[in-house]
Amino acid sequence: MKSILENRPALAKEVNKVAEVAGYLWQKGWAERNGGNITVNITEFVDDEIRRMEPISEVKSIGVTLPYLKGCYFYCKGTNKRMRDLARWPMENGSVIRILDDCASYVIIADEAVAPTSELPSHLSVHNDLLSKNSPYKASVHTHPIELIAMTHCEKFLQKDVATNLLWSMIPETKAFCPRGLGIIPYKLPSSVELAEATIKELQDYDVVMWEKHGVFAVDCDAMQAFDQIDVLNKSALIYIAAKNMGFEPDGMSQEQMKEMSVAFNLPK
């Protein structure tokens, strides 16, 4: 059977972005074993032939009703699949799903019946919220950046915007390319409804949120842009740690310098 990506260059390009990001996550050491997830709303790339495709799985319950996702299509990383494998074989380690009209269930339509991530309800709940606000964001990326996670083991960095201001101050690019900062979510059980609800709430003010002692969750227009936000934040964490390892507390950019950037580049914060 031919791949859903065949003769669909726009869709193939979007899935290949996911594969490229998956490779970066593995190379950086942020995706141990099957760690991390990527879910992308690909509805805009769906044609009539895809809409007529028969499911290759039974109907599966999402576990929650998501009214804004009716008729939407997503590419999802598979459960227990490794990012390093997805980077090479995206359609063997992920699948395309169709949300059914009840907005509470889905079927897999391509290429193989790869069950989506166990965190699918959380990811889809975020996408439902994004659509409810007419957000242009189509991708959600969850990964385990080492240095950012390390910072959450220190109580002071769990206070609102303490980590944001520190990370912004390390290098101008972080302020410029992650302009809404880093939200903080106190530890909650992985894959829980409570974690999903807290994530949606925190994403009202941030594009990237930190799950204490767990990882990062980011949203953006595509998987690459979501990755970029995480990448610049972790670069700042590395600069901070490098300075501490040299035996000094880094000065960082001043509040006045960061405010100057916000005005000059019309940043939201």
UniProtKB/Swiss-Prot annotation:
Bound cofactor: record note = Binds 1 zinc ion per subunit.
Instruction: Please give the catalytic activity noted in the UniProt record.
Output: L-rhamnulose 1-phosphate = (S)-lactaldehyde + dihydroxyacetone phosphate
Its annotated compartments are: Cytoplasm
Keyword match Iron-sulfur:
no
Q: Its domain of life? A: Bacteria
Q: What is its main location?
A: cytoplasm
Pathway this chain belongs to: Carbohydrate degradation; L-rhamnose degradation; glycerone phosphate from L-rhamnose: step 3/3
Q: Which GO terms describe its biological process?
A: pentose catabolic process; rhamnose catabolic process
Which cysteine pairs are covalently linked by disulfides here? none
Q: Cellular component per GO?
A: cytosol
Q: Which cofactor does it need?
A: Zn(2+)
According to its UniProt record, which residues of this chain constitute the active site? Answer: E119
Q: Does the keyword Magnesium apply?
A: no
Binding-site residues, Zn(2+): H142, H144, H214
| Single GO molecular function | aldehyde-lyase activity
Task: Give the enzyme class.
Answer: lyase
Regarding protein family, the annotation reads: Belongs to the aldolase class II family. RhaD subfamily.
Known function: Catalyzes the reversible cleavage of L-rhamnulose-1-phosphate to dihydroxyacetone phosphate (DHAP) and L-lactaldehyde.
- What NCBIfam families does this protein map onto? PRK03634.1 (NF002963)
Entry protein name: Rhamnulose-1-phosphate aldolase
Tell me which species this is from: Bacteroides thetaiotaomicron (strain ATCC 29148 / DSM 2079 / JCM 5827 / CCUG 10774 / NCTC 10582 / VPI-5482 / E50)
Q: What is the lineage of its organism?
A: Bacteria, Pseudomonadati, Bacteroidota, Bacteroidia, Bacteroidales
What gene name is given for the protein in this entry?
Answer: rhaD
